[in-house]
């Protein structure tokens, strides 16, 4: 058994969708989350910029004595997963391969992928899906504006529905069977996405397969926690009030504390 916390990072509030699943599946695990809202958004940054930011956060989490790091951000997974796996002395997992694996476990013939500009531009999902199932037809489309809708607390509004309708127009008449939510902000827009695409299109949230793999890894290393008083500590590099608002809305069982942090160049 290992009561050390699991470290989780994202560019903003999206990582809360992964923490929500983590708490459902592994309620006895403590969590330390860093939302890098001071550098939001990641989706329009260069690979090198994202790597630098992710490495700083990884070093901070290491200082908090985490036993594992989850990159709860598709953009950062695509840009920095391999780097962090090489640089940090703990297991580091991302969300892209689990998301692709979740999609290919079903016998879909045609699916869609939405993500940030960066995630879609570098073809992270398309490449991974092609390796897992070369016969799968994949339509990828950036939906960068939807990230800000979530970050600004506008889910459930007419503005959110209009933005979703516009960004997902590319899938009109395409007969996709499923859609990978290739940004951790997007699960908070599932209602609006279903309204646009119809309930027959399956929405794939990579968080579920990601946490399943995390549990499998920790089980194999005998590092699962038996802590009955587990905690969720949240940190923001931006305005902690925004993270508090998101946590109050999307973490049904609450959190332990939320604070602002500054991450210097050395991490």
Curated annotation (Swiss-Prot):
Chain sites annotated for binding substrate: 10-11, 42-43, 74-75, 184-185
Top EC class for this record: isomerase
UniProt record, GO biological process: cell wall organization; peptidoglycan biosynthetic process; regulation of cell shape
The entry's keywords: Cell shape, Cell wall biogenesis/degradation, Isomerase, Peptidoglycan synthesis
Active site as annotated: 73 (proton donor/acceptor), 183 (proton donor/acceptor)
EC id: 5.1.1.3
Catalytic activity reported: L-glutamate = D-glutamate
UniProt xrefs under InterPro entries: Asp/Glu/hydantoin_racemase, Asp/Glu_race, Asp/Glu_racemase_AS_1, Asp/Glu_racemase_AS_2, Glu_race
Family annotation (Gene3D superfamilies): 3.40.50.1860
Gene Ontology molecular function: glutamate racemase activity
Recorded metabolic or biological pathway in which this protein acts: Cell wall biogenesis; peptidoglycan biosynthesis
Residue ranges of coiled coil: none
HAMAP family: Glu_racemase
PANTHER family named among the record's database cross-references: GLUTAMATE RACEMASE
Function as written in the Swiss-Prot or TrEMBL entry: Provides the (R)-glutamate required for cell wall biosynthesis.
UniProt family annotation: Belongs to the aspartate/glutamate racemases family.
Name of the protein in its database record: Glutamate racemase
Organism this protein belongs to: Limosilactobacillus reuteri (strain DSM 20016)
Lineage: Bacteria, Bacillati, Bacillota, Bacilli, Lactobacillales
């Amino acid at each position: 058994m290992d009561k050390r916390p699991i470290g989780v990072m994202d560019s903003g509030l999206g990582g809360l969708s992964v923490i929500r699943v983590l708490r459902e599946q592994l309620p006895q695990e403590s969590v330390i989350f860093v939302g890098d809202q001071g550098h939001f958004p990641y989706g329009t940054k260069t690979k090198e910029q994202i790597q630098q930011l992710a490495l700083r956060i990884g070093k901070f989490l290491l200082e908090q004595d985490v036993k594992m790091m989850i990159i709860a951000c598709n953009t950062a997974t695509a840009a920095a997963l391999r780097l962090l796996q090489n640089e940090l002395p703990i297991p580091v997992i991302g969300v892209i391969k689990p998301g692709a694996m979740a999609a290919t476990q079903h016998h879909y013939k045609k699916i869609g992928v939405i993500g940030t500009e960066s995630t879609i531009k570098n073809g992270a999902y398309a490449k991974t899906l092609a390796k897992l199932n070369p016969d799968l037809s994949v339509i990828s489309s950036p939906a960068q504006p939807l990230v800000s809708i979530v970050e600004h607390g506008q889910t459930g509004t007419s503005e959110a529905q209009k933005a979703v309708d516009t960004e997902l127009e590319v899938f009109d008449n395409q007969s996709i069977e499923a859609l990978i939510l290739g940004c951790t902000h997007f699960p908070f827009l599932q209602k609006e996405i279903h309204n646009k695409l119809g309930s027959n299109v399956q929405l794939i949230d990579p968080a579920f397969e990601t946490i399943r793999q995390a549990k499998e890894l920790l089980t194999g290393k005998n590092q699962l926690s038996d802590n009955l008083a587990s905690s969720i500590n949240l940190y923001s590099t931006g305005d902690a009030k925004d993270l508090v608002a998101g946590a109050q809305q999307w973490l049904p069982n609450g959190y332990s504390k939320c604070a602002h942090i500054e991450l210097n160049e050395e991490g």
